C-alpha cells in the first residue's frame, strides 16, 4: 500500500522524479500523442511532405474542421498528433515567434531556431507546478537556406531532426515501413506516395482525399501549401491503380 501511495505522489507531482528517474505526467502526455491519429513527414531534396490522417469519429463530422495541418509562416508548416487544443496553443506560439523574428531582423526565422523556441516553451511545462505538459507532438517542416528541414517535437521538450518520421497512432508499423521504403533521392511526388502508402499500413478502411491532409514545403520556392482534397485523391488513385496492376501481374505468374 505504501508503494502505491508513493507512485500516486509521483503521478500528481509534475516536478517530482520517481526513484527510477521518470516523470509520469510527461509519459502520460506521450500516451495522449499515441491516441491521436497519425501524422507523417518525409524529407526529399525537392522539399518536405506532411501527410495527416483526418479520420473522423462520425460520418456527420465535417472533415475540414479537423485541424492537423498548420501554416506557421510562408516557409514553414506543421502537422500534429494528440490533443487538438494543445496543438493550437503551440502553433499560435510558433506563429508569434516567427513574426517576432521578421519584425526584429527583417528575415524569416530559421526552422531549427523556431523548433528550439517551441521545445523550450514545451519544456517549461515539465518543470512548473500547477501546470501540465502539452499532450501533443508536432512535425515542423520548412526550408532554411534552400535546404529542406524536418523536426519532431516531444511532450518532454526534446526535438529530433528526421529524414522520415511518424507520430501518433500506429507509429511503430508506419515507422518500420518508412525505414524499409525511404530513399534519399525521392521527389516530392514520390514522398507523397510513400507517406500515403505508409499511412495505409494497418488500416481497415480505405484512404480518401477527404480523409487525409497533405502539405508541401517546396525547396525551390521556399513556400508551404496544402493540397485540395481532389489533388490528394489523385495520388490515392495512382497508388490503388499501381496495387491493382501488381495483383494482376501476380495472377499471371
Swiss-Prot record:
InterPro entries: Ntn_hydrolases_N, Proteasome_alpha, Proteasome_alpha-type, Proteasome_asu_arc, Proteasome_asu_N, Proteasome_sua/b. GO terms for molecular function: threonine-type endopeptidase activity. One of its GO terms (biological process) is proteasomal protein catabolic process. SUPFAM superfamilies: N-terminal nucleophile aminohydrolases (Ntn hydrolases). The keyword Cytoplasm applies. GO terms for cellular component: cytoplasm; proteasome core complex, alpha-subunit complex. It holds the Pfam family Proteasome. PROSITE patterns: PROTEASOME_ALPHA_1 (PS00388), PROTEASOME_ALPHA_2 (PS51475). Residues 237-253 have a biased composition (Acidic residues). Keywords: Cytoplasm, Proteasome. It is found in: Cytoplasm. It comes from the Archaea. The formation of the proteasomal ATPase PAN-20S proteasome complex, via the docking of the C-termini of PAN into the intersubunit pockets in the alpha-rings, triggers opening of the gate for substrate entry. Interconversion between the open-gate and close-gate conformations leads to a dynamic regulation of the 20S proteasome proteolysis activity. Residues 229-253 are annotated as: Disordered. Belongs to the peptidase T1A family. The 20S proteasome core is composed of 14 alpha and 14 beta subunits that assemble into four stacked heptameric rings, resulting in a barrel-shaped structure. The two inner rings, each composed of seven catalytic beta subunits, are sandwiched by two outer rings, each composed of seven alpha subunits. The catalytic chamber with the active sites is on the inside of the barrel. Has a gated structure, the ends of the cylinder being occluded by the N-termini of the alpha-subunits. Is capped at one or both ends by the proteasome regulatory ATPase, PAN. This is Proteasome subunit alpha.
